[in-house]
A protein has these predicted regions:
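Conserved AdoMet
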Residues: 1-104
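Extended basic-aromatic, gly/pro-enriched interface segments that bind polyanionic ligands
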Residues: 126-127, 131-208, 212-220, 245-247, ...
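A short glycine-rich, Lys/Arg-flanked "PGG" loop and its adjoining helix->strand segment in the class I
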Residues: 222-234
Length: 265
């Protein structure tokens, strides 16, 4: 993009931040520009000013655009092999030191990830009857958090869930959707939080931040991972997405124990 377009983009991001509460300055500039441009073209906007008018006049478009930018693609047991590794290796190692685990799902989207944690823990109680847990789940998107609290899911979100687990932990409705059972939902607290601005309170044994920061600038990622390190208990686990790597993780006090998993040392 030329200099004028850069100025227009900077102007738009400031206006959009004030309108929607999502600060785009922390995201990789060129990638975010391409995503916004593709969305603008799909909506028939002639430029940033025209697109801003569309957003100001249509709250539904604001929500849809935020979802587009924050990539609200979510389903239960995403990357099943990683969840198997979590339940077979990392959680038992944590339970060898304590019976009560605190989990934070940072960037929980519509709730599939924190509910997956809860289902995993419930199933693990067969071998670990003393296991207790609490789950804190946050997202920057108000609509996503509302959907997570509602706990109602269509078939695509359940594609990686074994049928017996669907029968055990969900209730089907006449429309073909499935609602998470209250016994699971009661162990999770959902909250609105911008990872760039919010304070990280509490201490956790597991923090999951998967496929959330892929468009963040590298310096923002590094700062965020440092804050996660501070929020973890000693020996705690940071669970990332399949394409995410912490460069120079040892400088932050992490040990890369396997793909997607970092341990606080």
């Amino acid at each position: 993009m030329d200099e004028n377009t850069d100025i227009q983009y900077s102007w738009f991001t400031k206006k959009f931040s004030a309108l929607a509460g999502l600060d785009l300055a922390h995201y990789k500039c060129q990638q975010m520009k391409r995503r916004i441009k593709s969305y603008m073209q799909a909506k028939g906007a002639s430029g940033f000013a025209d697109f801003l008018k569309m957003l100001e006049n249509n709250p539904v478009t604001v929500v849809d655009f935020k979802n587009f930018l924050t990539i609200n693609v979510s389903y239960f047991f995403r990357d099943t092999d990683k969840w198997d590794e979590m339940s077979n290796n990392h959680v038992p190692a944590l339970l060898s030191r304590k019976n009560t685990l605190a989990v934070w799902s940072a960037g929980c989207s519509i709730g599939c990830e924190p509910y997956t944690f809860a289902i995993m823990f419930e199933e693990m109680r067969k071998k670990h009857p003393l296991l207790k847990y609490s789950i804190f789940a946050t997202d920057v998107d108000l609509e996503a958090v509302a959907a997570a609290k509602a706990g109602m899911y269509a078939g695509d979100a359940l594609k990686s869930v074994r049928p017996e687990l669907i029968r055990k932990y969900f209730t089907a409705d006449p429309g073909g959707k499935h609602k998470i059972n209250g016994s699971i939902a009661n162990n999770i607290k959902f909250s609105l939080l911008d990872l760039h601005k919010g304070r990280f309170e509490g201490k956790y044994d597991i923090i999951a931040c998967r496929n959330v920061v892929i468009y963040f600038e590298e310096n923002i990622k590094y700062e965020l991972y440092g804050k996660f390190h501070s929020a973890l208990n000693p020996g705690g686990i940071l669970f990332l997405g399949g394409s995410e790597i912490i460069f120079k993780s040892e400088e932050l006090g992490f040990k890369n124990i396997s793909m997607c998993f970092y341990q606080k040392v």
